[in-house]
């Protein structure tokens, strides 16, 4: 308890220092620009790694930075500094002002609209400092690694266990009078091992992450899951080239919807560089599927009271009954499109994709015969056409049951068709991502094998 109270007092002191830094920068810029915005952050924590129970690395870090953007006569200049002394802040502000003199005027440039700002940011319960000493952190990492190593004699090597615990302070202010900040924590534990059988070697990992230590799985759970995942990959086979149904396991299904983020981002829309350019208000997913955004989810890993421009975040339906309801807009992209910012400067905030109640095992039965994808490789996705082609590994399924692991295959399709034809989304929700969804069943994809 004493350690946690010490961290809390340190963070409160840091926050006051950061607020003073932001106020100083804004004051220096106020008479020399039409508008300004300042963001400053400080992250402190410990990272520990072990291998065969021995300490590999113990790293303490305390990193901070201030960034300022000024706007003058529709010209924009930005500068940053890791030194928060008054003299350094003054130099940084002047550097931003100097840069603005040489940039081209842009009528869409400027501070976020005042009526959209989060002048009263809510507390989202993101701050849970850990009472973990370096010795305890080392023990947690070693236990996770050891649990994996002891699970099976086929596990012959290890890449180690790791534990991370960090707390951070973010403060944002602008020339509209906004000055808000919040504190947050993030803790994680992981392990990675190598298994060997008949000359074949495979590796995999497992991890747990949360805002509070109490949200983490035990080291023994991490090790056991790591061992299970690694052993399941042994003796993979290759597939013949074919077309077949595909299940994206939950941890890769999040990426399937991650491509939607880029496709509906305001920057892609005003540049006309997205295959969903004419899709606003149209159906792009099955009519039973809705994507909700919950930026104020308590303790959420992607929760935030405001975006990186100070715009307040709000609960939204991104997709409603399969229909795309809005673009993801920053202040700049919104002005380019004649719209208002949606609070998405810096990314998305806790997307939730509701499943249809089927377990993963029930989805296997529904698919019958086909491919389960558990790993994806490469970046073969076109933002212009939606064409999708990526290296994959996973498991072959027959009669609703997993038969054997597969590797060295490529799956291909087009995202428009893939999204529109989703058969079902499972109830095995992956909660460790900014996109929370279960496994996804597609009726057919091209599979390129041997």
Swiss-Prot record:
Subcellular location: Cytoplasm
MF terms (GO), sorted A to Z: metallopeptidase activity
Highest taxon listed in the record's lineage: Bacteria
UniProtKB keywords: Cytoplasm, Hydrolase, Metalloprotease, Protease
GO cellular component: cytoplasm; cytosol; peptidase complex
Transmembrane segments annotated in the record for this chain: none
E.C. no: 3.4.-.-
One of the GO biological process terms: protein processing
Family: Belongs to the peptidase U62 family.
Note from the entry: In strains containing the pMccB17 plasmid, required for the maturation and secretion of the antibiotic bacteriocin microcin B17 (MccB17).
Function, in words: Metalloprotease involved in CcdA degradation. Suppresses the inhibitory activity of the carbon storage regulator (CsrA).
PANTHER family xref list: METALLOPROTEASE PMBA
Protein name, per record: Metalloprotease PmbA
Organism this protein belongs to: Escherichia coli (strain K12)
């Amino acid at each position: 308890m004493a350690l946690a109270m010490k961290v809390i007092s340190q963070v409160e002191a840091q926050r006051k220092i950061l607020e003073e830094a932001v106020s100083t920068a804004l004051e220096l810029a106020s008479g020399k620009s039409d508008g300004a915005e300042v963001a400053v952050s400080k992250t402190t924590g410990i990272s520990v790694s072990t291998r065969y129970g021995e300490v590999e690395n113990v790293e303490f870090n305390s990193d901070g930075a201030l960034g300022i953007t000024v706007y003058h006569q529709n010209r924009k200049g930005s500068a940053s500094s890791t030194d928060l002394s008054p003299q350094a802040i003054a130099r940084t502000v002047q550097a931003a002002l100097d840069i603005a003199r040489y940039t081209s005027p842009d009528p869409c440039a400027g501070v976020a609209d005042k009526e959209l700002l989060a002048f009263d940011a809510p507390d989202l319960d993101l701050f849970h400092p850990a009472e973990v000493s370096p010795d305890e952190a080392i023990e947690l990492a070693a236990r996770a690694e050891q649990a994996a190593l002891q699970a099976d004699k086929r596990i012959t090597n290890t890449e180690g266990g790791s534990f991370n615990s960090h707390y951070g302070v973010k403060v944002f202010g602008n020339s509209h009078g906004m000055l808000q900040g919040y504190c947050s924590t993030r803790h994680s534990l992981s392990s990675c091992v190598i298994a060997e059988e008949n000359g074949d070697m495979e590796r995999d990992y497992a991890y747990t992450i949360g805002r509070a230590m109490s949200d983490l799985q035990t080291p023994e759970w991490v090790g056991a899951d790591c061992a299970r995942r690694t052993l399941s990959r042994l003796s993979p086979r290759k597939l013949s080239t074919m077309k077949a149904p595909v299940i994206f396991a939950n941890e890769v299904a999040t990426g399937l919807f991650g491509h939607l983020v880029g496709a509906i981002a305001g920057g892609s829309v005003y540049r006309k560089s997205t295959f969903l350019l004419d899709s606003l208000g149209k159906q792009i997913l099955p009519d039973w599927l809705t994507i909700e955004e919950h930026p104020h989810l308590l303790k959420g890993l992607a929760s935030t009271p405001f975006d990186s421009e100070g715009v307040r975040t709000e609960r939204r339906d991104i997709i409603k009954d399969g229909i795309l309801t809005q673009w993801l807009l920053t202040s700049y992209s919104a002005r380019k499109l004649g719209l208002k910012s949606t609070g998405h400067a810096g990314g998305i905030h806790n997307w939730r994709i509701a499943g249809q109640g089927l377990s993963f095992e029930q989805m296997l039965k529904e698919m019958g015969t086909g491919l389960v994808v558990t790993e994806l490789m490469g970046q073969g996705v076109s933002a212009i056409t939606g064409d999708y082609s990526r290296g994959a590994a996973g498991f072959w399924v027959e009669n609703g049951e997993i038969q054997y692991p597969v590797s060295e295959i490529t799956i291909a399709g087009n995202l428009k068709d893939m999204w529109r034809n989703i058969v079902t989304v499972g109830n095995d929700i992956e909660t460790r991502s900014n996109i929370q969804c279960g496994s996804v069943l597609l009726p057919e994809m091209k599979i390129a094998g041997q």
